[in-house]
Structures are given as structure tokens and as C-alpha cells.
Amino acid sequence: MRFCWISILLIICTSASALVPIDKPNLREETGIAPAYFGPNAFPVPDMLDGRVQNHLRVEVAGDGYFGYQGDITTDVLARVHVPLFTDRVNLTIWMPVMEWYEMTPERMTTCRVPDSLAGRGHGAGDVYFSTDIQILRDRKWAPDIALRAACKSASGGQYELARHYDCPGYFMDLSLGKSWYLGNEAMRRKGDEARGVELRVAGSAGFLCWQTDNGRQNDAVMYGLQMLVKSQYVSFRTTWSGYVGWENMGDRPMIIKGRLSGHTKGFEPYVEYQYGIKDYPFHMARVGLAYHIDILKKK
């Protein structure tokens, strides 16, 4: 457990100050530093845990295409890695959009308050995210899996003046619960992909998310999410409804729904994913990715 608390402290303490002036902040004044007025990688709705943490070393690379409701287009390359911290109950996750390429329409630039004098197309690196994921409880006959996650994002993403990234730190913490039922072979619970059977899983999550805005202020939000999973030996489908609710109520309440179809074979997981922004996240997203995992803890 010592590694758990050390990792949490490192995450909470690894934050930088936003490059904004501090001058008598007016808490009633809306900032507009919110998902509705920035690029899709500014502070998207975090991927939801399903009550379980990764107990394998998992490396993932994906390509994303974001198609804005106002005609703007963003493509990026996403990288993610999960590293178990000497136990199958705790892992460190690091992810980032390594590079994005974007083209904004004049309409979108007006919505985001980008000056006409700036070019609405270009490329740039994104923010880096870190999280510690902790398995608090494993499911029993009637009890669900419970996982706690503490995460922060860097202020490394640039092009604030082009409304691509916030240029400020942020963090979130959430608790997820999930329960599975098995059809065909109860042994699938222990043997994973090696067993024949179907897993049906339902999960929910709730948490707190925060990011610094301007003038020394921050926006606090409540996170939420529901998820369903159907998984067989070689294929799985997962659908998620999630979002967060900021206190300013000015473009800071993104809500999305997405579905992912994955294959499973010999440690590889190719997948395709589609995401639709329901509110305050004006983008369709299509993703194609490949993940590979290795049992470095030799638990099997």
C-alpha cells in the first residue's frame, strides 16, 4: 500500500501554474475556458473505468478523427501505457495526444473567439495525463469490483490563443463500480480470453474534476458515467455514456456517448470506436487503435 499513497501524492503535487494574471478575480464572471469553445483535446471527458484496473503492461496507439459540428476537422495520434506498480491492484497510466493537426472554419473561430488575424489551421502537441488506478475491492458473490483513480493533466499543450488547449493544469478523481455475469462458462471469470463464454458487465462511476481557468480561478465539476460490456472469447462491445458538469454553466458541461468494438487474440486488441458529443462537446469522433498487453507480473 505504500506505493499507492506515494503515487497519489506524486500526482496531486505534480501541477503547474497557468500562465494567466491574478488581479482581483470576479467569481461571478464567466471565463469561457470550457470544452465547448476549445479543441477536442483541451480537456475531453475522461475514459471511464469499469471498477477494474489493468493488471498487465498495456501499450496502446490510436489514430483519431474529430469532425466538428461547425465544419472544423482535427486528427491526432494518441499514445497510452498502463504499468502495474509491483502488484495487480495498482497501476500507473500515462496518455497523451502526441500530435494533432487541425483546420478551423471561420464560423468555429468566431464561436471560440479566435482573432481573424490568426491562421485557423496548424498542428501541435497535446497535454500529458497521469493517473494512479487502485483496485480497492474485487467482486464477491454480491459485491462489485471497486476502483479509485486519481489523475492530473499537464499544461504542456500550447496554442491557447487558437483555442486548442487551456494552457493550465487540471486534475480529477473518480470512483467506479462494476459487476459481471457470465454465460456459458463460469471459469471465464478466472481464465479471461482462454475460456469460452460470454461476460455481461454493468458499471457506473462518479467523481470530481477541476481545471484552472483565468485570474487565479478554477472550474469545479462533477463527473458521472454508465457503461455496459458484452465480451466473448474473441470479440467485445462496450458502450459508455459519461460527462461532467461544471459550475459556470457556460460550455463546461460536456456529455458524450460512445461505442467500442474490439477483437482479442494472443495479447493484441485491435479496435474501432465512435463517439458522439451530446452537449458542450461539438464533435463526432472516429478512432482506430491497437493495444498489446503483457503479463509482466506473471499472475497466470
How should these model regions be labeled?
Residues 1-34, 297-300:
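Cleavable N-terminal export/targeting peptides
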Residues 19-154, 161, 169-184, 235, ...:
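Transmembrane beta-barrel domains of Gram-negative outer membranes and organellar outer membranes
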Residues 63-69, 96-102, 136, 150-156, ...:
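Transmembrane beta-strands of outer-membrane beta-barrel pores
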Residues 72-77, 105-111, 157-165, 187-190, ...:
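Outer-membrane beta-barrel translocator domains and adjoining extracellular loop/strand segments
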Residues 88-92, 139-143, 183-187, 200-202, ...:
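Repeated loop/turn-to-beta-strand initiation elements of outer-membrane beta-barrel proteins
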Residues 114-117, 215-218, 222-300:
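Outer membrane beta-barrel transmembrane domains
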Residues 166-246:
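Detector for outer-membrane/organellar transmembrane beta-barrel domains
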